[in-house]
Amino acid sequence: MQSSLAVNEKVEILAEALPYIRRFHNKTIVIKYGGNAMTEEILKQSFAKDVVLLKLVGMNPVIVHGGGPQIDSMLKRVGKEGVFIQGMRVTDAETMDIVEMILGGLINKEIVNLINRHGGQAVGLTGKDGMFIRAKRMLIKDKEDAEKWINIGQVGEIEYIDPSLIKLLDARDFIPVIAPIGVGEEGESYNINADLVAGRLAETLKAEKLILMTNTPGVLDKNGNLLTGLTASRVDELFADGTISGGMLPKIKSALDAVKNGVKSCHIIDGRVQHALLLEILTDEGVGTLIKSEG
């Protein structure tokens, strides 16, 4: 027999979730899925259950996934090493083939299958399907020479996202699972950072929330302390003083652009915590770092 205390605690948890379920009913929540949550079995299972539950209580989760560690593993198997500049993967033609194989094939279908096994109806896509993510080659500015631009290969900069396909799937109660691969004017493939795709998609869909899952508790200051709440202006300061760097750069850029362009809030959460999505969306305290526009 469970103790009455344990039962009461469960009831309180359910009661705490009720106002959030009501508030976010029929709202779109874009989730960037990555990090340890994609590789550890217990975290994969809890993620899938969370997504299905969000859908069942009336929210519209849209998943954008990464796959960096899996891509790196395959590159090593073929004798190549991953190279990053300012948090972006340098992508030559051979690397692009591997990216498409891993992201659009192996990982995407694994996530779809996982969600479906837990009672959801997930559909896997890349941005090439219906050409719904149009992209062009990205050039990045050299930190040492402001007038110099660096070509990092088939890395895409988003030009346009057509939301009609995603809205159609949402309306039919499917859960879109999107690999961040875009398509150019000539049909060429582009590897796009998953954080940037998630942010731009959240803007396009006018999402209530953007959630980025990471391998850290959230945004940390220079002493390693968690910053639980940030405004857009404070984020700009952290960019300027170098607190935000490396792989966190595209995440924060995605979050900042999203909240400046109509997304109500962005949450950077620790994907290593079981049921992190539910803790963030359905509890009073939440987890991780909340980023909002001014005010």
UniProtKB/Swiss-Prot annotation:
Name of the protein: Acetylglutamate kinase
Binding-site list for substrate: G67, G68, R89, N191
Stated family: Belongs to the acetylglutamate kinase family. ArgB subfamily.
Major location (coarse): cytoplasm
High-level lineage: Bacteria, Pseudomonadati, Pseudomonadota, Betaproteobacteria, Nitrosomonadales
Swiss-Prot/TrEMBL catalytic activity: N-acetyl-L-glutamate + ATP = N-acetyl-L-glutamyl 5-phosphate + ADP
GO molecular function terms noted in the UniProt entry: acetylglutamate kinase activity; ATP binding
Native species: Nitrosomonas eutropha (strain DSM 101675 / C91 / Nm57)
Function of the molecule: Catalyzes the ATP-dependent phosphorylation of N-acetyl-L-glutamate.
Biological processes, Gene Ontology terms: arginine biosynthetic process via ornithine; L-arginine biosynthetic process
